[in-house]
Amino acid sequence: MSQYQNQYGAQTGMTDEYGNPVNQVDQYGNPISGGGFTGEAGRQHFGTTGGATDHGHGHGQQHRGVDQTTGYGTHTGGVGGYGTNPEYGNTNTGSGYGTGTGYGGSGTNEYVREDHHGDKKGVMDKIKEKIPGTEQSRTNTDGAGYGSTGYGASGGGIGNTGQEYVREEHRVDHGEKKGIMDKIKEKLPGTGGCTGH
């Protein structure tokens, strides 16, 4: 019977087939609040009502364009209202993966890391920083000129060519729990975490 209620009357909250209240959600499943306010008024009252519709781009990209902030509500005459407020500006997306620059050259140290201040790093980004062989925080010492001057083998450079220098501390504290990073390092091949137990 709930489907027959308020057919021609005032717009009230939506209900499901059992009469339970249902919240409006946007296309991504985020709840929408803002009855009575449209456009700029809804945005000022509720913050960014409906959320910014910034579609996902690849990591490390910078998206310049229109950021649509939408507000939903009812108009004073009973007609459903929908207002948009375009905001122009820069929206930084991505979490700073290394770009692969810094290879080659004549023995220069290049520190490849994009720092986006204000961005939060995810767990995977923190893990990738700690693992050797990833490009998250790499100090390249690709010394093309150092090999022939007696610092190492021909073309070898100082240290390992193209590898990052990571100080790894392998502590075995018996009786203490291992951290998440230690457990992950043990699972990955080539990280030196396998102790042979």
From Swiss-Prot:
The gene is DHN1. Residues 16-31, 126-190 are annotated as: 2 X approximate repeats. Induction: By abscisic acid (ABA) and water stress. PANTHER family: DEHYDRIN XERO 1 (PTHR33346:SF42), DEHYDRIN XERO 2-RELATED (PTHR33346). Sequence repeats lie at residues 16-21, 26-31, 126-133, 183-190. Residues 1-14 have a biased composition (Polar residues). The keyword Cell cycle does not apply. Belongs to the plant dehydrin family. Residues 1-86, 133-197 are annotated as: Disordered. This is Dehydrin DHN1.
